[in-house]
Design a protein with these regions (language model features):
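Extracytoplasmic metal-acquisition and chelation regions
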Residues: 2-339
Length: 339
């Protein structure tokens, strides 16, 4: 074999080796890229909690919601097999709790996925002291909210709610309508995510701080609205916590909201009292659940319109294209518009 042939063979071997190594590198790069795209996942029962969780989790988790369709009732929701699988493979399952989405508790019990129950976390936070948790976030607004607003809500308004409604269902499971509760939830979520990814704990805390700062702006708007007269008829206790924080007075005849929420017709006496109240001129607005209706409710809405009483709609789910802050601001703006 002459020198020229040896050189040619050497070049071929070198080329083949280079192509082979390049292929390995390319394959490894693709695997790395594919791996980087596969983030840990969080599943939330509703798009409200998915949005709030996503704002805290940021780039390090993919967050999805089981329920985003406003025609779906979370109280009677049934998850598909695919959704059950997604929950079982998730790193965290965020549920509202408090009896609102009980289907989620059944789903969670069938998996090993850790559950973040907002209602239970808030109860534990109140027992431990909201100011302690807010202080951990390192944000001035969070501390103010935990100290000042918690006192207002717990001392002044909670007493009113307890006095007026007693043991009745007062909408306390609709905790996303309490700005203070949502602040505390964001802080607690940041702490939980920091446990799952300690290396990103500060990132989550910073995101929670930014979120709480935006909620603090809404609380200032809420505080300004609390000076207005707020006598209202509550066709559904959906936004009861928001109205309590505003210091508004619920004049709804006892038993109406409970019957409406349960899908039952109120008694003739309750209906007559409701009609008389709406026609009396005492109300600033009629509050209804935009996702539910009934012949009785439609008749009361018509009566309200004829009596010059504004009808304000409140929702259980985020409208498409809005985040939580924008959604709550729109609700406060709708209340401000009736002054």
């Amino acid at each position: 074999m002459n020198t020229k042939t040896l050189k040619t063979l050497g070049a071929i071997v070198a080329a083949v080796t280079a192509v082979s190594l390049s292929g390995c590198a390319s394959s490894a790069a693709e695997e790395t890229q594919s791996g980087s795209e596969s983030k840990p996942t969080i599943v939330a029962t509703t798009n409200v909690w998915a949005d709030i969780t996503g704002q805290v989790a940021g780039q390090f988790f993919d967050v999805t919601a089981l329920i985003s369709d406003t025609s779906v009732d979370p109280h009677s929701y049934e998850a598909s097999a695919r959704e059950q699988l997604a929950i079982s493979e998730a790193d965290l399952f965020v549920v509202n709790g408090g009896g609102y989405d009980d289907f989620a508790l059944t789903l969670a019990s069938a998996t090993e996925t850790e559950m973040f129950n907002v209602y239970d976390v808030l109860e534990a936070t109140e027992l431990e002291g909201g100011d302690e948790h807010a202080g951990e976030s390192g944000d001035e607004h969070a501390e103010e909210s935990a100290d000042e607003h918690a006192d207002e809500s717990s001392d002044e308004h909670a007493d009113e709610s307890a006095d007026e409604h007693g043991d009745e269902h007062d909408g306390s499971d609709h905790v996303w309508y309490s700005l203070h509760s949502v602040e505390q939830t964001a802080i607690s979520l940041a702490q939980k995510l920091g446990e799952l990814q300690p290396e990103n704990a500060q990132y989550f805390a910073d995101n929670a701080d930014a979120f709480v700062s935006e909620i603090a702006v809404l609380e200032q708007k809420l505080e300004a609205l609390s000076a207005m007269d707020g006598h209202y008829f509550e066709a559904h206790p959906l936004a009861a916590m928001l109205f309590a924080d505003l210091g508004f007075e619920n004049l709804t005849p006892e038993g109406y909201a409970e019957a409406e929420e349960a899908g039952l017709e109120p008694s003739a006496r309750i209906l007559a009292d409701s009609q008389a109240l709406i026609s009396s001129g005492q109300l600033q607005f009629l509050a209804v659940n935009a996702q539910g209706t009934s012949p009785v409710l439609e008749s009361l809405k018509k009566l309200a319109e004829e009596s010059g009483v504004p009808v304000l709609e409140f929702d259980e789910l985020l409208p498409e294209g809005s985040n939580y802050q924008e959604w709550m601001e729109s609700k406060l703006d709708s209340i401000a518009a009736i002054r």
